[in-house]
Amino acid sequence: MASAKLLQDLLQAARQSTGHDEIVRAEDAFFKALLKSTVYAHVPLEPPPPGRMRFVQFVRPDNGQTVLPFFSDREQAEFAAGNVRAIIAMAGRELLEQTRGATLMLNPNVDQIALYPAEVDAILAGQSIGTFSKEVITESEQVGACPPSCPTDALTSILREHFATEPWVRAAYLVELHRGPEFADISLFLGLVVAGAHHERLLQLTTLWLKTALKDWSMPLSILLCNPDEKLPEIFHQGIQFYGT
């Protein structure tokens, strides 16, 4: 079993990593250790029906999603449980297997790591879930934008297939960006119009879908999500719309 301290150290390493490959290795190491760690979850005080296991869930105040909390150490679990919930300990792999189909949140009062069902399936299968980092384009930066000049049919086909099952995705755009000295740094920009409560979920799932289906994709890809009631960013109009109306 991996200790709670080791798990926290691996999480810290993943958050401090910078380069893409370094982040992937750190996150893979963290989730591999999570499966082998003892984790803690909340269950009702009253006993469950014979042959069944019941877990406590809560509704996130930030987006209204129902999540099942679990914890990497007993102290966090006890603090959150108070006197109204019981605590159960089990291996991380066992918890993920028993709660398949639920959205999980690791250490909701500290780390707030949301794991959606498709990500849980990937972790249990020993696969990477996809990696992203936040980036800021300043107003002073000169950026060129145009429709994609490289083949993108595989990318847009995969995303259209998945977005068709997500009613919260209203539209999707793809733009080619030119940045850096002489605009020589080329990347793709994916713009999504998504209901605000589902921004996090669609960001994480889109990253997973692309990681799983396009293993040989090498061009950097940035993602920006905006709400349906917001004015569409001008940069969206510089590329192509491949989904929605």
Q: How would you label these PLM feature ranges?
A:
Residues M1-T245:
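An interfacial alpha-helical scaffold signature
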